[in-house]
Swiss-Prot record:
Protein name: Phosphoserine aminotransferase
First-tier enzyme category under EC: transferase
Subcellular localization(s) per the UniProt record: Cytoplasm
Requisite cofactors: pyridoxal 5'-phosphate
Residues modified to N6-(pyridoxal phosphate)lysine: 196
Gene that encodes the chain: serC
Entry GO terms, CC: cytoplasm
Binding site for pyridoxal 5'-phosphate: 104, 150, 172, 195, 247-248
Function as written in the Swiss-Prot or TrEMBL entry: Catalyzes the reversible conversion of 3-phosphohydroxypyruvate to phosphoserine and of 3-hydroxy-2-oxo-4-phosphonooxybutanoate to phosphohydroxythreonine.
Keyword Transferase found: yes
Signal sequence residues: none
Amino acid sequence: MTSTPIIPADLLPADGRFGCGPSKVRPEQLQSLVEVGSSVFGTSHRQKPVKDVVASVRSGLADLFSLPEGYEVVLGNGGTTAFWDAAAFGLIREKSLHLTNGEFSSKFASVAKNNPFIGDPIVVSADPGSAPEPVSDPSVDLIGWAHNETSTGVAIPVSRPAGSENALIAIDATSGAGGLPVNVADADVYYFAPQKCFAADGGLWIALMSPKALERVAEIKDSGRWTPDFLSLPIAVDNSSKDQTYNTPALATLLLLANQIDWLNGKGGLDWATSRTADSSSRLYQWAEASEYATPFVTDPAHRSQVVGTIDFDDKIDAAQVAKILRANGVVDTEPYRKLGRNQLRVGMFPAIDPEDVSQLTKSIDWVVSQLG
């Protein structure tokens, strides 16, 4: 093959963005930056115009997740990566337990292990592509896992393990929040970032925190434990209650996030969003199961993610070459997670992505593979 094949136009998706974060941003979100941006860009984040945007985000998320009484929407700068450190400083009293099954679920466990103020965590691991069973241990005061392991496309439902009454349940929902079913009351901390289901830029973390979690934040503060101000959950809680962040936020991120939340709520809320991602994912997995050369990487259908699909290819087909040809035709970011090292494609199926585009993607893949023979 001397030149890049040109995929027929009738096989291409209308929008070729299938990244797992940063993810597709709707055109209407970008237009909203133009329409409302002049009233907030270049203005103080301590004044009403910007605080109104933060208030919209907080109230919109409370509606989207049907936030139980006493729960608070807390936010801060730095993304999920910063929140892991903030949680190690401000949520773990003595010792934590972590379920790990991939790159991102392992990161919080690593942060907890390296924090000098708490004990070494208990780590319950499963191989990439599979899911550990949520468990408890009487020695721990926080149990954490990823609602959706972005690197592998494995989803683990949110629940309270037996015997966990004295532990906070902290769920990393970075790529799952807004696209997977959840009852937030089953967690004490449900935290995420805007660049996945919420179709915004990164650099912000959001945590839905229960009264029990808020009490833990205050308890650890009162203990005198040293914490960098940037990672201080008491400071984040206080600022969030005033509809602001500790330090200057990226306003474009907040505006994109606010618009996406309004869009999701306007369409029917979390039920609508999860039915849309279920539609998209069923199209991808059914195609793979019927394919002669592709198969879902996650073998247990109960743990196949609705928002991140990983598809293994027969060794005779070079998935990297397929992704390269797709990219040359405007269908982008289908490459697998770099450290997983598998012959596969990874497909984002967040709410902004049209299920019809997922179907078109499978047609494009079939056509590309037919040209490689």
